[in-house]
């Protein structure tokens, strides 16, 4: 079923007095940044950009929430390009992300939108040479996009100077502030100036995360979507009833023969399942690539580049790929396994239908998974229908 909302009718729980700005031209950006925005392919700001960009540019702390695929990463990049003082080669913005892939994507987006400004951004992520990080930081960069562990390591070494940092962005903050990364976030935060501007940007913001923001945000502007309104425009959602786990593979092969797939991502719940399914598909003469967190960074980068450049059309992945990766040609997302919790669902299926394009999400469901499917429907206030036999 298509998402119950279109972007024009999203209802935002927005701080009083924050009005949408319908044109980038009216946001007070300098001409070089504005040119970069239009060159990047935007014609008008998305709903979340209309509300969040100006408060960020005015120096307010901001909590911004919108569904996946509405330009949150670009919103970060635009803010970074506008805020930094290009004449000073000191780090002025830190963007922290939960995965290496998202941190790299953010760095690339900053460089693309800031192409006319001479902005220098660098991705500080694990899996790459510490020596290269140190050299790049010592030469001077305006913005750092990274994972918390590597960023804090660079701060401790003295290679990343924080005195000039004026903006901290926590991207996918629900994941960032979860149990695994919370302490690292606080380590970085304590090394920053006391008057630091903080922005949290995410597709989901559970109540306990919002409560935690009180510790390091001052009178934040809130731009929020209610959980029961957080459905996805332009994505048709279906399930396929499979009686047994071993029948999923045959079902997947059948879909290959029926559907017109531009590009697809197939999600599994474990790295072991990703490897098993990849081998099974290849042994049946299907051309697929795979991605999970155990792969070396260079291999992950190569796989990403092949998928982005359309050299690879089908990717089998674990949830390392579920957050924040902009591949705008993905037409289908297949949940070979139903995600372990409802909040992962929106991140997975948000890979299809990016920026208003139509997409299809198909969920393989055993009888024991039906409760989880119903939980997802309740969580997002949506209906996932059984896939019709004539879907092409």
From Swiss-Prot:
InterPro entries assigned: DEAD/DEAH_box_helicase_dom, Helicase_ATP-bd, Helicase_C-like, P-loop_NTPase, RNA_helicase_DEAD_Q_motif
Subcellular location(s) of the protein: Nucleus, Nucleolus
GO cellular component, one term: nucleolus
Reaction it catalyzes: ATP + H2O = ADP + phosphate + H(+)
Main location: nucleus
Domain Helicase C-terminal intervals: 234-392
Highest taxon, organism lineage: Eukaryota
GO biological process per UniProt: rRNA processing
Motif, Q motif: chain positions: 22-50
Molecular functions (GO terms): ATP binding; ATP hydrolysis activity; RNA binding; RNA helicase activity
E.C. designation(s): 3.6.4.13
Binding site for ATP: 66-73
Keywords: ATP-binding, Helicase, Hydrolase, Nucleotide-binding, Nucleus, Phosphoprotein, Ribosome biogenesis, RNA-binding, rRNA processing
Occurrences of domain Helicase ATP-binding (ranges): 53-223
SUPFAM superfamilies reported for this sequence: P-loop containing nucleoside triphosphate hydrolases (SSF52540)
Motif (DEAD box): 171-174
Sequence positions bearing Phosphoserine: 87
Physiological role: ATP-dependent RNA helicase involved in 40S ribosomal subunit biogenesis. Required for the processing and cleavage of 35S pre-rRNA at sites A0, A1, and A2, leading to mature 18S rRNA.
Family: Belongs to the DEAD box helicase family. DDX48/FAL1 subfamily.
UniProt note: domains: The Q motif is unique to and characteristic of the DEAD box family of RNA helicases and controls ATP binding and hydrolysis.
Protein name from the UniProt record: DEAD-box ATP-dependent RNA helicase 34
Source taxonomy: Eukaryota, Viridiplantae, Streptophyta, Embryophyta, Tracheophyta
């Amino acid at each position: 079923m298509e998402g119950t909302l279109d972007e024009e009718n999203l209802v935002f729980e927005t701080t009083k007095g924050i009005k949408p700005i319908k044109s980038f031209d009216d946001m007070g950006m300098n001409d070089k940044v504005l040119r970069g925005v239009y060159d990047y392919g935007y014609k008008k700001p998305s709903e979340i950009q209309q509300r969040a960009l100006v408060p960020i540019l005015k120096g307010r702390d901001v909590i911004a929430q919108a569904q996946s695929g509405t330009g949150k990463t670009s919103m970060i990049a635009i803010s970074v390009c506008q805020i930094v003082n290009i004449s000073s080669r000191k780090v002025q913005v830190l963007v922290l992300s939960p995965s290496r892939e998202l941190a790299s994507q953010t760095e690339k987006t900053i460089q693309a939108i800031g192409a006319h400004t001479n902005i220098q951004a660098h991705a500080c992520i694990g899996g790459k040479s510490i020596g290269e990080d140190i050299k790049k930081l010592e030469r001077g960069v305006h913005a750092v996009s990274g994972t918390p562990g590597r960023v804090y390591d660079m701060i401790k070494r003295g290679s990343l100077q924080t005195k000039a940092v004026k903006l901290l962005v926590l991207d996918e903050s629900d994941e960032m502030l979860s149990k695994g990364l919370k302490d690292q976030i606080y380590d970085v935060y304590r090394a920053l100036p006391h008057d630091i501007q903080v922005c949290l940007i995410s597709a989901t913001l559970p109540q306990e995360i919002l409560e935690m923001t009180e510790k390091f945000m001052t009178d934040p502007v809130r731009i929020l979507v209610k959980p029961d309104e957080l459905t996805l425009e332009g994505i048709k959602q279906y399930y396929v009833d499979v009686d047994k786990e071993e029948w999923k593979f045959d079902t997947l092969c059948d879909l290959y023969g029926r559907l017109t797939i531009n590009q697809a991502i197939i999600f599994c719940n474990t790295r072991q399942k990703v490897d098993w399914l990849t081998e099974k598909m290849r042994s049946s003469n299907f051309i697929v690539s795979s991605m999970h967190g155990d792969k070396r960074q260079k291999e992950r980068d190569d796989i990403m580049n092949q998928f982005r450049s359309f050299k690879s059309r089908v990717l089998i992945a674990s949830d390392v790929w579920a957050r924040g990766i902009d591949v705008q040609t993905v037409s289908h997302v297949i949940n070979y396994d139903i995600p372990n919790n409802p909040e992962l669902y929106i991140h997975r299926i948000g890979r299809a239908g990016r920026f208003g394009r139509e997409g299809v999400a198909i969920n393989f469901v055993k009888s024991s998974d039906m409760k989880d499917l119903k939980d997802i429907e309740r969580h997002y206030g949506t209906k996932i229908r059984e896939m019709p036999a004539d879907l092409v």
